[in-house]
């Protein structure tokens, strides 16, 4: 066998020319222990907080504890595939999530993988799930209403775009129902919605998604599901995934509504992980930084100025209380972070007042700045009248000998409560809310028995949509979004016609028991 020296030298020269001296350097460690969704890793001395780690069998983790001799990581996948002694590699990346309009209409898990059997998501951009909240100078004041379509909330506890409003109450008081109604009411309002389910039953999530599909709300909604069957690390990550998706839209000038259902279970999952990572426990065994857990999440909701996109994120976190105790650790934390709370009472719920909003205990720190003028004009005395009613109701139980003024206050309060009762998934437009509130403010409902109020609501809304003259007045109010004296009188006259129509159909109706007879005779004139 003969060798051509020239050919060999050419081959060697070619290889020298194409030699790539780049060295790929990877840092790796070893799993010391694994269990309960936590891995302790030795050897990753340069790992950073929140870094993505790669385990064998395509399982990933995230650094959550940095100790002198080891790194504590949460496992974002099947921990049964990991063994002691396995090699763990750094990725030099933090946890990221896909963002953009491709997610609309989809149900994803906390790792942003689709779980709705509708195929892969064609995303073009990702963002890290942890980032500093929008700075003070980048924000705008909250001045635009985010309509929930729920009369009790939009009138007495208004929510503005960019606000954080807590929904708090015992289990089975309608917290999720309010959140779902708020999403359904955003149809055709150019608001994108995100529903983050934390520790919920999978059957509950299926029902939520079916409701959203039924009312055409899934087309502008993303559902992030970290259900009760998911490990604690995924439940911990899910709200941050949700708000990261929202931030992309906010920076592109969109308004976003995000629901966290619920942050009580989020705190429990974080407590579980912290105890397993051997962090020192504090009050109720929660770690010392549980306040920061929620504050850094909720502070990312904002309304930004035009230089930063001009969009907004409105957050409605949900907290579940035990026997109405809002002074527990997590409820007080979240109350102090948010811009107000909607308190749901199990007592009201059991009395049939639904939504069971306790208006006396609820507050919106943004207030009337987040209301259109027409609603602001007619809802001013609502909270006061209800407060007087609840105060007098307690005294009325002790004696039946009441003066006329007290009877009138009790009667008006009972009728207001009936006016605020609303069927689920039946949102009201702002113009319809303004008309209903006008009938309350003008004391027009005093002519009706309490049991006729629900029928009155249906009749008056129907009248202003079907009667030609009334419809024109409704349209005018919708356009100018404020009551002038003439329009107010014209709308009241139409409302009086509805009252007369109902009272004529009541057997043995005696107007004298409700007010001055001559005043009743002038209705509709």
Curated annotation (Swiss-Prot):
Entry EC number(s): 7.1.2.2
Enzyme class: translocase
Membrane topology: Peripheral membrane protein
InterPro entries xrefs: ATP_synth_asu-like_sf, ATP_synth_asu_C, ATP_synth_asu_C_sf, ATP_synth_F1_a_nt-bd_dom, ATP_synth_F1_asu, ATPase_F1/V1/A1_a/bsu_N, ATPase_F1/V1/A1_a/bsu_N_sf, ATPase_F1/V1/A1_a/bsu_nucl-bd
Single annotated GO MF: proton-transporting ATP synthase activity, rotational mechanism
Pfam hit, one: ATP-synt_ab
GO cellular component: plasma membrane; proton-transporting ATP synthase complex
Signal peptide: none
Entries under Gene3D superfamilies matching the protein: 2.40.30.20, ATP synthase alpha/beta chain, C-terminal domain, P-loop containing nucleotide triphosphate hydrolases
Site (Required for activity) location in chain: 362
Annotated compartments: Cell membrane
Binding positions (ATP): 169-176
This protein's UniProt keywords: ATP synthesis, ATP-binding, Cell membrane, CF(1), Hydrogen ion transport, Ion transport, Membrane, Nucleotide-binding, Translocase, Transport
UniProt cross-references to SUPFAM superfamilies, sorted A to Z: C-terminal domain of alpha and beta subunits of F1 ATP synthase, N-terminal domain of alpha and beta subunits of F1 ATP synthase, P-loop containing nucleoside triphosphate hydrolases
Catalyzed chemical reaction(s): ATP + H2O + 4 H(+)(in) = ADP + phosphate + 5 H(+)(out)
Subunit structure: F-type ATPases have 2 components, CF(1) - the catalytic core - and CF(0) - the membrane proton channel. CF(1) has five subunits: alpha(3), beta(3), gamma(1), delta(1), epsilon(1). CF(0) has three main subunits: a(1), b(2) and c(9-12). The alpha and beta chains form an alternating ring which encloses part of the gamma chain. CF(1) is attached to CF(0) by a central stalk formed by the gamma and epsilon chains, while a peripheral stalk is formed by the delta and b chains.
NCBIfam families on file: atpA (TIGR00962), PRK13343.1 (NF009884)
Family that this chain belongs to: Belongs to the ATPase alpha/beta chains family.
Record PANTHER family: ATP SYNTHASE SUBUNIT ALPHA, MITOCHONDRIAL (PTHR48082:SF2)
Function (record text): Produces ATP from ADP in the presence of a proton gradient across the membrane. The alpha chain is a regulatory subunit.
Cited HAMAP family: ATP_synth_alpha_bact (MF_01346)
Protein name, as recorded: ATP synthase subunit alpha
Gene name linked to the record: atpA
């Amino acid at each position: 066998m003969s060798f051509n020296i020239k050919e060999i030298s050419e081959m060697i020269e070619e290889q020298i020319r194409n030699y790539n001296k780049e060295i790929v350097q990877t840092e790796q460690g070893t799993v010391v222990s694994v269990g309960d969704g936590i891995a302790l890793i030795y050897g990753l001395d340069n790992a950073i907080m929140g870094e993505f780690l790669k385990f064998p069998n395509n399982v990933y983790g995230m650094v959550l504890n940095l100790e002198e001799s080891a790194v504590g990581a949460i496992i974002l996948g099947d921990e049964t595939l990991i063994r002691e002694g396995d090699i763990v590699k750094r990725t030099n990346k933090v946890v990221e999530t896909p963002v953009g309009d491709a997610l609309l209409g989809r149900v994803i898990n906390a790792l942003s993988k689709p779980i709705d059997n509708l195929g892969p998501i064609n995303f073009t951009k990702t963002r890290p799930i942890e980032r500093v909240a929008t700075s003070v100078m980048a924000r705008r004041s909250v001045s635009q209403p985010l309509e929930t379509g729920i009369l009790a909330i939009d009138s007495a506890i208004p929510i503005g775009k960019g606000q954080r409003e807590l929904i708090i109450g015992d289990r089975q008081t309608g917290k999720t129902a309010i959140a779902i109604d708020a999403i359904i009411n955003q149809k055709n309002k150019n608001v994108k919605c995100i529903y983050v389910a934390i520790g919920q039953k999978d059957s509950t999530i299926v029902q939520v998604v079916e409701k959203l599909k039924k009312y055409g709300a899934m087309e502008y909604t993303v559902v992030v599901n970290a259900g009760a069957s998911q490990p604690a690390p995924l439940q911990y990550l899910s709200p941050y995934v949700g708000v990261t998706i929202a931030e992309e839209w906010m920076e592109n000038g969109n308004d976003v509504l995000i629901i966290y259902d619920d942050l009580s279970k989020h705190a429990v999952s974080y407590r579980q992980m912290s105890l397993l990572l051997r962090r020192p426990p504090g009050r109720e065994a929660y770690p010392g930084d549980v306040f920061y857990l929620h504050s850094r999440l909720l502070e990312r909701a904002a309304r930004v100025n035009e230089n930063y996109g001009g969009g907004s994120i409105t957050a409605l976190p949900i907290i579940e209380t035990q026997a109405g105790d809002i002074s527990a650790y997590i409820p007080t934390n979240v109350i102090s972070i948010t811009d107000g709370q909607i308190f749901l009472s199990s007592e009201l719920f059991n009395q049939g007042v639904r939504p069971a909003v306790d208006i006396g205990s609820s507050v919106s720190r943004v207030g009337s700045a987040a209301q259109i003028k027409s609603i602001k004009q007619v809802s001013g005395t609502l909270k006061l009248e209800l407060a007087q009613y609840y105060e007098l109701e307690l005294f009325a139980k002790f004696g039946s000998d009441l003066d006329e003024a007290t009877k009138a206050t009790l009667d008006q309060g009972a009728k207001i409560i009936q006016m605020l009762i609303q069927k689920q998934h039946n949102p009201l437009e702002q113009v319809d809310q303004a008309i209903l509130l006008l009938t309350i403010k003008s004391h027009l409902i005093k002519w009706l028995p309490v049991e006729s109020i629900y029928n009155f609501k249906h009749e008056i809304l129907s009248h202003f949509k079907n009667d030609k003259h009334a419809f024109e007045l409704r349209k005018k109010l919708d356009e100018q979004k404020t009551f002038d004296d003439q329009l107010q009188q014209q709308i009241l006259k139409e409302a009086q016609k509805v009252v007369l129509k109902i009272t004529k159909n009541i057997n043995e109706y005696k107007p004298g028991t409700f007010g001055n007879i001559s005043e009743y005779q002038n209705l509709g004139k």
